[in-house]
Amino acid sequence: MLKPLGDRVVVRFDDEKEQTVGGFVLAGTHKESTRKATVLAVSETGVRTITGDSVLPSVSVGQEVLVENGHDLEVTVDDEKVSIIRESDIIAIVTK
């Protein structure tokens, strides 16, 4: 697994697929402005303020979050597609 640095977070997007009558699986055809994801890893160091204090990420592993669409770097690790995002691109934590 990846170990993110600074204000970065590793997530897996929970993309829903649509299935047609013929059984073909298609990715969603219309783009949402946000995407739901599960947090897989967060930075252990956070970012430093101008005074040198460390600000740790406010999300934790396992949480579901909403992320602005298009603000991710997709990578493949151990045959799994994951994305690296900045914590500031997370707009909400999903609660149940």
Curated annotation (Swiss-Prot):
Secretion signal, residue range per the UniProt entry: none
Stated name of the protein: Co-chaperonin GroES
CDD domains tied to this protein: cpn10
Statement: the UniProt record of this protein carries the keyword Ion transport: no
Keywords tagged on the record: Chaperone, Cytoplasm, Stress response
Protein family per UniProt: Belongs to the GroES chaperonin family.
UniProt keyword annotation of Transferase present: no
SUPFAM superfamilies: GroES-like
GO CC terms: cytoplasm
One GO process term, biological-process aspect: chaperone cofactor-dependent protein refolding
Primary residence: cytoplasm
Subcellular location: Cytoplasm
Pfam families with a match to the protein in the record: Cpn10
PROSITE patterns: CHAPERONINS_CPN10
HAMAP family linked: CH10
PANTHER family in the record: 10 KDA HEAT SHOCK PROTEIN, CO-CHAPERONIN GROES
Matches recorded under SMART domains: Cpn10
Entry GO MF terms: ATP binding; metal ion binding; protein folding chaperone; protein-folding chaperone binding; unfolded protein binding
Source organism (scientific name): Streptococcus pyogenes serotype M49 (strain NZ131)
Function recorded in the entry: Together with the chaperonin GroEL, plays an essential role in assisting protein folding. The GroEL-GroES system forms a nano-cage that allows encapsulation of the non-native substrate proteins and provides a physical environment optimized to promote and accelerate protein folding. GroES binds to the apical surface of the GroEL ring, thereby capping the opening of the GroEL channel.
Subunit structure: Heptamer of 7 subunits arranged in a ring. Interacts with the chaperonin GroEL.
Source organism phylogeny: Bacteria, Bacillati, Bacillota, Bacilli, Lactobacillales
